[in-house]
Amino acid sequence: MVVASAPGKCILFGEHAVVYGEPAVAVAIDQRVTISIKTHQKPGATWKLEGVPFIAEKHPHLEGLRKRLWHLSEQTPSLDIAINSKLPSAAGLGSSAALSVAFSAALRAARGRRVDEKGWCEGFSSELKTDPYNEPRRGHEAGFIRNGGRRLLGKDAIDEDECAILAHAIEAEVQKGRASPIDSSTVSHGGCTLLSDDFEKGLDWRYSRQLSTPEGKRNWEVHDVPVPQDDVWLVIGNTGKYSPTGKMVERVASMLAAEPERMNEIITIGSIARRGADALKKGNMEAVGICMTENHLLLRGLGVSSPELENLVKAAANYSLGVKLTGSGGGGCMITLTREPKQTAEAIELAGGRSIVTSLGTSGVRIDDDENVPFWTPGVADS
């Protein structure tokens, strides 16, 4: 059996502004999606999900990863798959990215990874020319397979970068060519991530991402933001109201088209995101909280808050260093930075929300069990 897990995430700064090239900052949270896979004896490389036959059309994230990592053939073992999620779905907490990252890690651990003494490595990476967005299969591995080479198995085969780039490719595929890499990068690497269209001074650059979208080619620079050791918590308040991200993004786009002078508010949100990242780096959590509240006021001015969100924001404010909606708005969740997590969670619950308490910047993807790997040895046709 292989067991892999990945955390959810929440956006600290930069919602909506990131669509227009401004930076956004996200942190990994304690709540995780866990995936277990094991082989079963039914022939024909079939998959079962939660004990029933796998239907690709109903699970596009899993199917996209199957195409890239587990090509079905008579030699490929059949799998039983189980999913355990501590993240609410469609709440802006990165549940789909966590699912993709955890599943990519589980499949990689189960099949292993070939490497050689010259530094060649099977798989997908920001440093390789391979394209997980458009090239699910890797034919040029044939020579290496014939010539031998060392093989990494289980947790030793896992690469956070590969998990992140595969998850972004799957998100783009499912969302018809539109997907930011902030969710996939944050839940794969853990910690805190800043995404921008440009290199940001004073932060460690991680890698670049490119994506061909219906609107043209997009480029992002992904940075690591240090998270200080401090007795401070995030409390997430879930309104229970679902609001499609696309609808809220379109609302802001329509407003900016009608009132182009309001682009100044978008630029200001970007400035707040940079100040917030700098405050995190310096360990000034009071300043982080101030930036969060300022960000919320601007998002509210853009019309993406809701009565339900405002009710929870108001309830939590007295116990918070900072408070804001997180994600696209219109519903979903709000977050508060606090040194009093119990009182804050109780205030959110009394106001009608569902509370989640988490630390900031938890660990990213990991393998929790890798017994009896590899499940099979891919041949040339399976790679």
Regions found by a protein language model. Give the residues of each.
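Glycine/serine-rich anion-binding loops at beta->alpha junctions
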Residues: 5, 84-107, 180-181, 321-338
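Residues at or immediately flanking beta-strands
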Residues: 78-80
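Low-complexity, intrinsically disordered segments with a bias for serine/threonine
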Residues: 128-130
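C-terminal nucleotide
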Residues: 1-7, 11-13, 18-19, 26, ...
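Hydrophobic alpha-helical membrane-insertion segments
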Residues: 134-136
